Amino acid sequence: MLFVFAEADRYGFWMKDMLFSIDMFWLDDKGQVVHLEEDVSPETYPDVFYPMVPARFVLETNAGFALEHSITIGTPLVLKNSPTVSK
């Protein structure tokens, strides 16, 4: 799931009502990963996960996606078939 915000900020995410673990990626305006949390379990609720720096997008994927695709901080992500978002 992709979350798109009007401006970059330190948006927090939690695992309330989730049934499975996920990876979370916070991306800047250019789609570059600025923070990530891997294999976040539903049992972490009510903890809230915040990026270290402001981000404009948050992408949630199945757990293990970051490891499988060697995604780390600084990795640029290209989202195919996504509309361009402008301010």
Could you tell me what each predicted segment is?
Residues 1-87:
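Compact, glycine-rich, soluble single-domain proteins
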